């Protein structure tokens, strides 16, 4: 059965019977979006949350048979049939971008698609297709359960078959697609086939400033769950007016896989749901059970003085959801944080404090694997960011791998979560930009919904972003309204091209504005906070006037920082013909004549291999959360200003060092530094400085 989203039909755009060239078809038989979680059969396994240890989980990552063709009219049409011989095909690993595995070629364009522009159609002469096939085994103990097939991200559109039967279709390269394959799978050996289109109508909403890659680029796996199961849940932590106590809300939605007709309420009567909260010391601070009367349950508990989550203090609690139904017990465990993000008095507040956004834009990029980024690389990025006083990341310009958000929760990093929507190459005129074309509205809402539903429970997500460089119009009005209608936490919404007077942004978030524009906003139009979505373009010898920006930002309350463009060079490892290593960019890896934006992808604060570049040291200095000023060099009086919002400086050890001509002349400690957040104090060092021309270093 074909279940497809529909949009407004006009004669403005050419039509096609191909699903991948039809904005009326966003997905076929895809399951509804939900938060990221896994249910386990024991509490112990749920706490560890290692999917690979579940007997009801099976990874499909690894080696698949693969065939690549440069044109869609050359794709195999019967390879998905059960028993069809693909032994003569090549091999490819999953997840991977096929260009990084030797099939086709990658190219980099900052905007403009790199293909003939004729939405929603794709010119057949440049329409690569990859066909994948492999086998998998369904264990006997999965019998009687619902079997779900999960794709974390496929660029840019794909079909899937199981045992020769067509299961479904989906698009959107950066959010998950799940399918119920219970009717198609059998106990024992099964065959799965996937056909991926590099370019599709969805690609017209993915014109981001990055390498153009394709393929199954995030995890693929199967999991089995009882017929009655938790379909989704939403956590809301509503802080009181003093930001001290909180109302903890948990909304749980159950489903019954035997309810094949989605028009009726699933039969779950008699199921029991229990929730508990445990603090970092292992103390249970709340537990409650409810018996389901229908498929939706609401838990509410007033929590006194919980430890709040922020980028400075990423306090987390462990939430356990237990479902008992039909003699089976399922456990779901995840971290939650008590955090409130809101706009008040033209300021962005986190837990009541007007925090500064000391941010960067970050593409998912690996110099050896393209858009496939592993956990070690994510952790390395977060460690480097924390070491250099960066407290916020804009996921430019699409939802990142789900593990990134879990790590941001743990490490403490604010996230501006951005929908996978950019149509830069269509221009910005109202009659051209896709943001103002009603025919594309369903696609805009679909991508926004899938981001929100997946990421809604992460405390790190303090702002939703509707997209990037797509223009302005009715479709962003619709997605703005959709988020505010569905996000019970009511986080602010950020729309890059909306301007400060448009009704579909809560934050004025321009890019690359000069300092006088910031001053004018602060003086004459401070109706909402200004947070630069991109600034301090870090290409080459740059970031020179960052301190000038921050002198102004710290002067006016409605100015609250921004996100530097960008974090990491998008270079790819390559060698010359004589074996010398270099970082490839633009069209280096493509045939002559391929569209290219040259080295415009090389504008990070760090190199592609995560080596620090010189200007990140300037960022560290400007973004630092303490300021020192020598008041009296004879008496050794030092003024110390605490720029943190939630941290007392008694969390730190202070040492001082007197240097002259590069030599350390004296050094010591400054004890008993007790300075609350946003306060200034004066401290006496242990030496009288007779020569003010010699620098003093305090760390």
Which functions belong to the PLM regions below?
Residues 137, 249-257, 637-645:
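Short edge beta-strand/loop segments characteristic of extracellular beta-sandwich folds
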Residues 17, 61-129, 194-228, 346, ...:
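Core domains of carbohydrate- and sulfate-ester-processing enzymes
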Residues 256-271, 645-652:
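A short beta-turn/strand-edge loop motif at beta-sheet boundaries
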